[in-house]
Amino acid sequence: MTTNHRPTLESKRGKAESISNTIFHSRSLPQHTSLKYRGDIRKPKVDTKIGKQAVEELKKDLLLNEGKLEDSLKINKSLTDGDHSMDEHISKTIDNQEDERDYNRQEYDERSIGKEEYSGSEDDSGDDSEDETAQLMEELAKIKKERQEEQEKLELQNKLDKTKVSNPLVQVVGASTEANFKIKKSWRDSTAFKKQNSQNKNDDETFTNDTLNSEFHQNFLTKYIR
């Protein structure tokens, strides 16, 4: 192909000469002036709730720590001043805590007793279900064995049938009668270059190199053409 129809580029003209027309090559034009974003990828969404929850938890921890420090300072001040009201308050809180512990222990004991009773009933039902599943598995195993034996019998029968049909030596014609086997002759038996015994040769036969006048060719003509 020729390129005479195309305009001459600036590199071909030289440095001194400048292009008089406004034709530019596509490579000299500005390219990739805008970014292309893929449409099949979605922008990741930032979940701000998780960050807010973390900040709130940190604030709660700080407030709790500050409250504990303030309580300890108040206790120390009451001890130094000789104020017995804080001692009474502390003793009350200790008594309340002990009462709560006793109540929790009672609830735990009641729950543990209920769980033991429920677990006992579950064990009984579980034993029954295990016995049923064991019986079902035994039945399934028996069914699988029976099906396997039937399939093996069918395969053996099919093999025997195939051998009887395919192999003529295995075919049985009758108990008293002898089998009449028909062995198919090979195509090599009717060739012109078959090795024949000297006893079968007749005195009248004469050897010839002419394939058209040979005995094989004459037999072929009489069989298929004449």
Swiss-Prot record:
One of its GO terms (cellular component) is catalytic step 2 spliceosome. The keyword Coiled coil applies. The keyword Manganese does not apply. Residues 18-31 have a biased composition (Polar residues). It comes from the Eukaryota. Residues 1-31, 78-134 are annotated as: Disordered. Residues 126-167 form a coiled coil. Residues 119-133 have a biased composition (Acidic residues). GO terms for molecular function: RNA binding. It holds the Pfam family Cwf_Cwc_15. Keywords: Coiled coil, mRNA processing, mRNA splicing, Nucleus, Spliceosome. Its main location: nucleus. GO terms for biological process: mRNA cis splicing, via spliceosome; mRNA splicing, via spliceosome. Involved in pre-mRNA splicing. This is Pre-mRNA-splicing factor CWC15. It comes from Debaryomyces hansenii (strain ATCC 36239 / CBS 767 / BCRC 21394 / JCM 1990 / NBRC 0083 / IGC 2968) (Yeast).
